[in-house]
Amino acid sequence: MAVNLTEKTADQLLNIDGIQLFTARAGIKQTDRADLTLMVLSGGNTVGAVFTTNRFCAAPVHIAKSHLFDEDGVRAIIINTGNANAGTGAQGRIDAIETCAATAEQTGCKPSQVLPFSTGVILEPLSVGKIVAALPKMQPADWADAARAIMTTDTVPKSASREGSVGEKHTVRATGIAKGSGMIHPNMATMLSFIATDAKVSQPVLQLMTQEIADETFNTITVDGDTSTNDSFVIIATGKNSQSEIDNIADPRYKQLKDLLGSLALELAQAIVRDGEGATKFITVRVENAKTRDEARQVAYAVAHSPLVKTAFFASDPNLGRLLAAIGYAGIADLDADILEMYLDDVLVAENGGRAASYTEEQGQAVMAKDEITVRIKLHRGQAAATVYTCDLSHDYVSINADYRS
């Protein structure tokens, strides 16, 4: 059950000039819905992308990395669900290359101008023949169709749009989709996300922007602490807006566009947590007054990853010693527990090394009963801060993953 997350309809999502969408039923795992998505770019565009840090990364990740900087630019993106094409060795790479070749033939570009993406079950060979057979049958689609077609264990399609000023006289549009529900962990996870904007941005600048946005959004979420083999985040700048190219990070428009796309990416990232497998609560962990942002993140992740903390939230049980224990084992060697403060929403829970004198069990129970909760931790060591988003851990998480291949 997703936490305060609903599907967006096609009329709520902005069309982006310079990109065409198509979907088809390839029948890779399921036969009752579209599982193949094609994005065709009209040319003159640039693409930035970041990929999983998992050393056992999937075959399409290897191929997409090698194609990203093709001298003639990316012209097509092909995405299949139902099979990750990971743990498939040399044959997996051959299958990913064949997918690119078939897509190139269908779209009129070079195979090296195609980026392939896969998501689904690991250690099973990809039915590349089904993809090749489905490509000529692709039907025009909208962003809502594409959001549904890239789903795996997701219960709600994830999409969003933004429109805002970049520069003095130009309005920029952006629309994005994402998938992900389990195996979600910082440094990218079992998630795919694609954002398209009509802004014009040079490739090196867009690549840097993509990396920075990923670090500030998708790298701040965790559902279960597992890092996937396939995760990827892509930004497409079609350049169809009439503004001049952003080719320098010193250009004031760089920050304006980054803020616009970052807001969109954060909504998509949070949607993944809201739809975390079996999730019933959306939890924000905010760590303040740390020496560095990395230190703040280290503490936030310790709390957000803890199964004991997450099950306490699921039970609406203010067993808050679990949170303090997680802070304590976060690995901050010189942390002074006697000066930190911890809050549940606005309720002071702990200070001076123990339970706050003003805190009552009834206050904690009232906050824990909510479906959206903020944990705020003040370390009183410096000025840095970081925020991480997570969800609770329920019986359904176990059931969903136990039944995943059945």
Give residue spans per PLM region.
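Generic structural marker for isolated residues within well-ordered, non-membrane alpha-helices
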Residues: C100
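A structural signal for small-residue-enriched, beta-sheet-centric alpha/beta enzyme cores
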Residues: A2-D95, E105-S406
